[in-house]
Amino acid sequence: MEEPPVREEEDGEEDEGALAKSPLQLTTEDVYDISYVVGRELMALGSDPRVTRLQFKIVRVMEMLEALVNEGSLAVEELRMERDNLKQEVEGLRRAGVSGSEVNLGPDKMVVDLTDPNRPRFTLQELRDVLQERNKLKSQLLLVQEELQCYRSGLLPPRETPGGRREKDAMVTMGNGEKEERTIMKKLFSFRSGKHT
C-alpha cells in the first residue's frame, strides 16, 4: 500500500523535470505533465470560484502551449527532412562533379531540368502574390455574398444608380475600348493556355 505514494513522488519529480526544461525542448508529453502538476496544485487550493476561473484560463494557456509545441515539432521535423535532402543532393553533386564537367553557378542560382515533371514552375514570391490575391478576391466575394443576402432578405433597400434607375434594373455594359486589368493569376497562367493577352 505504500508504493503509490512513492510512485506519486517519482511522477512529481518527473513532472517538475518538464517544468525545468527549456521551452525549445518541450514535447507534447511534457505539456501534459505540466498540465497534470498545475491541475493537482489547483485541486489542492479548493473549489473557490476564483480558482475555477483561474483553472479555465490555465487550461486555455496549456492548449496554446501544446499547439506551439506541436508547431515547433513539425518545423523541426521539416528542417530535418530538408537537411537530409540537402545532404543527399550535395552528395549527388559531389559524385557528379568528380565524374563530369562541373558548372559553378553560385549560391543563388539553380539549374532546372525542363524535362523533370516535379520541377518548380513558379518562384516563391509569385506563389505568395497569387495566394495574397486569391485571399483578397475571396474576402471580396464573401462581402458581396453577404450584401446580396441582405438585399434578398430585405434588410437593405436596392441602391439607386446615378441615372435614377434601381441597381437591379440597370444593365452593366462595358465598352469595347476598356481593357480588363490583368491580375497576377492571369499573367502566371496565360502561358499554359497559349493565350498572351
UniProtKB/Swiss-Prot annotation:
InterPro entries: DZIP_RILPL, RH1, RH2, RILP_dimer. Residues 14-96 form the RH1 domain. The keyword Protein transport applies. Residues 65-153 form a coiled coil. Gene3D superfamilies: 1.20.58.1770, 6.10.230.10. Disulfide bonds: none annotated. It is found in: Cytoplasm, Cytosol; Cytoplasm, Cytoskeleton, Microtubule organizing center, Centrosome; Cell projection, Cilium. It comes from the Eukaryota. Keywords: Cell projection, Cilium, Coiled coil, Cytoplasm, Cytoskeleton, Protein transport, Transport. Residues 119-184 form the RH2 domain. GO terms for cellular component: centrosome; ciliary basal body; cilium; cytoplasm; cytosol; intracellular membrane-bounded organelle; membrane. PANTHER family: RILP-LIKE PROTEIN 2 (PTHR21502:SF2), ZINC FINGER PROTEIN DZIP1 (PTHR21502). Homodimer. Interacts (via N-terminus) with MYO5A, the interaction is required for its role in dendrite formation. Interacts with RAC1. Interacts with RAB8A; interaction is dependent on the phosphorylation of RAB8A on 'Thr-72'. Interacts with RAB10 and RAB12; interaction is dependent on the phosphorylation of 'Thr-73' on RAB10 and 'Ser-105' on RAB12. This is RILP-like protein 2.
